[in-house]
């Protein structure tokens, strides 16, 4: 018998070489540890809620800022920087207010395949 359908994941994989990724290094250089923390928070919410994207509304902005004890404006600056560097897709963010990206989609498909094969 298969699992009950669920959109998000309880956990997700993280690459061990992520700290060598030039996009992550640029984010950390520009926004220090706060930038990386916000990026990881958003990734967590993406994988937890929908699995491969999140509609980042004012409520999500507030939640993120409140969690990290930051101003919403600063969180938004960091997210916009993440889109500029390609960590999130800039076009989808600007047009729809959705945060996702190529690596997020690839990881999502990989995790779905793992779940599918573990159910077989």
Stretch-by-stretch model annotation:
Residues 4-50:
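Short recognition helix of helix-turn-helix/winged-helix DNA-binding domains
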Residues 30-35, 57-61, 109-110:
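Short, low-complexity, polar/charged sequence segments that are solvent-exposed and flexible
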Residues 51-66:
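Short acidic, hydrophobic short linear motifs in intrinsically disordered regions
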């Amino acid at each position: 018998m298969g699992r009950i359908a669920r959109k998000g994941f309880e956990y997700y994989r993280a690459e061990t070489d992520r700290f060598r990724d030039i996009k992550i290094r640029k984010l950390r250089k520009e926004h220090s540890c706060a930038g990386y923390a916000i990026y990881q928070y958003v990734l967590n919410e993406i994988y937890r809620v929908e699995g491969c994207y999140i509609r980042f509304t004012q409520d999500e902005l507030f939640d993120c800022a409140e969690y990290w004890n930051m101003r919403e404006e600063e969180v938004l600056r960091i997210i916009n920087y993440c889109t500029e560097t390609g960590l999130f897709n800039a076009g989808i963010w600007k047009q729809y207010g959705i945060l996702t990206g190529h690596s997020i989609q690839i990881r999502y498909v990989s995790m779905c395949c793992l779940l599918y094969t573990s159910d077989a």
